[in-house]
Amino acid sequence: MRKTIKYLLLCIVTIGVLVGCSNSSKEENVESFIKKLVSYNTYNNMVSIEEAGQLIEDYKSRFGEYLTEDAFDLLMANRIFSKYSAVISDASGVTDINITKTSETQNDGYIHFEYEVSYKLERDCETVDMNDYMAFNVLDEKGYKIEKVSILDKTSSIFKEFKK
């Protein structure tokens, strides 16, 4: 009887650890994607926009490990990468990146995360405070890749800075 109880407790603890680690991996994937998206170093040595085919491959090599093909294609179609590239490349640096998870919802087959991302753009002699609001669907399969990315355009600073 004692062996059975010990075995059951060991199984429960093991399952708890595995579930906790897998959820952590999903969050790490999203947060790594966000850091790369807003990082100044990401856009160094980018090919020019005139070389469209090469530019797509360049973005894919930088962000492809985090995204499914559909998510990558949608971000390209919405010009999200080019907007971040234009705004961040115009700055002399990005500092104080702060990523805050504001929501997590478990759904059938994926987890929905929402984040508030704040950072500072350094320009000439000024600092611009940026706040972007992002939502992600992360698949339970496919190595925890991001299936969907939404950036709220009414409240996110990146769109206001891009229009300037």
What residue spans do the PLM features occupy?
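Bacterial N-terminal signal peptides that target proteins for export
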Residues: 1-8
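N-terminal hydrophobic signal/anchor transmembrane helix of membrane proteins
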Residues: 9, 25-37, 105-109, 113-121, ...
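C-terminal motif of bacterial Sec signal peptides marking the signal peptidase cleavage site
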Residues: 17-20
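Surface-exposed, charged secondary-structure patches
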Residues: 85-124
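A short, surface-exposed beta-strand/turn
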Residues: 127-145
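Low-complexity, intrinsically disordered terminal/linker segments enriched in charged
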Residues: 145-164
